[in-house]
Structures are given as structure tokens and as C-alpha cells.
Amino acid sequence: MKIVMLCDFYNESLEYQENLLVKYYVKHGHEVTVIASTFESVFDYYTDRHDKRVPPRTYFDQGAKIVKLRYRYNLMNRLRAYTRIDRLLEEEAPDLIYVHDIMLNLPECIAYVKQHSQCRMVMDYHADYSNSGRSALSLKLLHGVVRKWFLDRARPHLSRIFPIVPAGATFLHEIYKVPHAEMEVLPLGADVDLAREMRRRGEGRRLRSQMGFAADDIVIFTGGKLAPSKRTELLIEAVARLARLRLQLVVVGEASEAEAGYKQQLLELAKGRTNIRFVGWLGREDVYRQLDMADLAVFPASQSILWQQAIAAGLPLICGDTGHQDISYLNAESNIVILPRNEIRTDRLAQEIEAVAGQPERMHAMREGAARVAAEHLDWNRLIERTLRFNIPPPSFDDN
């Protein structure tokens, strides 16, 4: 099958949903083209620092063609579309168009689907009340009028809309008036193939030895973009309180320039504590090595793909729900301890870490539960079939 994906940002060194879709579509024999903007740096992307001088280019990643286009308009970094893709769609001749979020190039996709009845189109959706529509103007105008205008025209031609979390479906239903019947949650999966390969090769054991951790040390993984919303300072304080346990905390990730002060705050909190290590921003394979080494993952707040990656690596999770980021749909095997907003505190984190790390039987059961959840809900070998099923023709029945 020929698949064209539209996304605003693509960087081959990361493990975002787009990267994993590329990997697993190609693995299963599909031909993939990704259309994205000319953004290169994830930090520039999240701080809206777009350099319009960067030229368009085409290259290949994991067997997929990546086409990076300039924006033809970019209004306050909120409404932007890259140069028209009518001709590109005709050249690529996709069987499936996969749109990531409400892209303002949707009109070209709609026109293509209208002209090519065999082509299907699906869209995933990453926004919810926790990360979007934080002001009345944004909620009522940006989402409720402008983006809704584009989505309303696309909906008759979308085989399915895939919110990545249940809260996204609520947001679409309440703000965009999308019926629940048009949606189904498609979780952000993880690279289960890579996680299994790391385990098979013993990468975690090797890294554990390289970092000088003892066999009976309990290694805690945390990380992501180092920002105040992550509340990493609470975890550092909790680990400091649990000196009676043999804990080692590994912090993966980096801060943007705007949040360098927060990183400095974390470094000051960890100063003199040899059991707290900052290892910086890592590529995806190195992230999975760290996960394979760890015994437990703790994320005080602000959900990221690392949560799914940790489950894929078979780790018990302790995490905080700051609101509209309920992860209970991935807690089918009691593999996650979820702290509600009013309990995201140093003392509660310390209490739950001790309750899990201090009970080997419970930690083992949570690990086994995480492995089952990963196989059932986070394996892209299975998840991609949910996006492709609309192209499978119904069986024909011969009356004779």
C-alpha cells in the first residue's frame, strides 16, 4: 500500500509517533512518503522559532521518502500551511493519506480523495484541555472557529479520527462537535521491537555495569524536556528522602534555552548526591538502553512519549495526573501508580517509590503487567492495522 503522511514536524533522530509509523509501515511492506515543514530542531519547533530561510529538501529515512516544504503562510505560529501539495499528491498516488492533527493543507487532501475514490484518509489528534485552548480566545476562535472550519470540511472524507488519549476525544466532541462514533483512541505506541532487541542483547545489564551500579541498586528512570511542568524537582527531593534505600536516579533529557534556569535548579537540588545523574538528551536507542537498565520509571507530571516507552520496556510506572491526562487506559494490569493532582507532592512520591521498590514481588508483578499492556496496546505491529483497515475491500460473495 502507498501511504502519504502529513505532519508539521519530522526529525529522524527522535521517536515520535510519525517516526514509529514510518518504521512499522515500512517493516510490513508499505511504501511511505512523509510531508513535513522545514523545522529541524525539536526545541525550535516547541518554542516556535522557525527559520523561513531553510530550503525545502527531500531525503530518505528508514526506507521512507521525507519531503520537507516551506510554509506558504504562518500566522503567529498558530495557523500555518506548507506550500500546496496538489501536484505532490498526484505524483505519490497514495492509497491512504494519514494526517497528523488538523493540518491547514487538508483542502488539498480533500480534493485528492474526492477525485480518487480508492484513496482513504484518516487523521489523528493530539490536543486536549491540558495542552490546548488555554485561553478563551484560543478555545473559541482558534479551535472553535478557524480549525473547526477545516475539520468540518474534512470530516465527510475521513474514515476515522484517532485521538491519542481519551481526553482528546472529549475535546473534539465538546469544542469541535465531533460525534464519538467518528472517533476511536489510538494510543501513542512504542518501539516494542527495539525494546525487545535491547533486552535480548543484554544492553541494560551492560550499561548498568558501565555506570557502576550494584546488582542490588534500584535504578529509577525519569526524563523528557526538562521543564517546570514535569515537576522533576519533586522526584529529586523524594529520592533524597529515601536514603535508606539503594536508589539510583537517572534523568534523561535537556532543557530549552528558555528553561535553562529550571535545569540549573535541578542541578542545585541534586548537588552532592552521587545517586542522581543527569545524562542529557539521548537518541532513541540510547533511551531504550537506559530503560532496559532501569527497574522503575517515575514521572511526577506532564505526560510524554517516555511514559509509553517505559511501559514497552516492561517498567512499573509511578506518575502524576495533572488533569486531562488520565493514563488509566494503559493501567489494565495494575502496572501504574497514578497520583491525582492534589497528591503530586514530594512525600507522596517518596511513599509510592518505597511501596513499589521495597516490595520485590509487587515490582515483579507490575513488570509482567507492563509487558502485557505493551503487547496489547502499544505494539505498532498491531496498531498500524487499525489505521489500514479502511483500505481493505469487503469480501465478495459469489451467489453461484
Predicted region positions:
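Acidic donor-binding loop of glycosyltransferase active sites
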Residues: D292-S302, L315-P316
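N-terminal subdomain of nucleotide-sugar transferases
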Residues: M1-R53, F60-Q62, A240, N381, ...
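Conserved donor-binding/catalytic core segment of Leloir-type glycosyltransferases
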Residues: V4, F162, A214-K230, I236-V239, ...
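Membrane-proximal helix-turn-helix segments that form the acceptor-binding/catalytic region
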Residues: P107, Y129, L141-I161, I175
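Short, structured helix-loop element that forms part of the nucleotide-activated donor/catalytic region
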Residues: Y45-H50, V54, T58, R206, ...
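Glycosyltransferase donor-sugar binding loop
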Residues: E40, A190, G223, Q248-Q264, ...
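A charged, aromatic-enriched C-terminal amphipathic alpha-helix characteristic of glycosyltransferases
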Residues: G358-N391
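Carbohydrate-associated surface elements
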Residues: T38, A167, G189
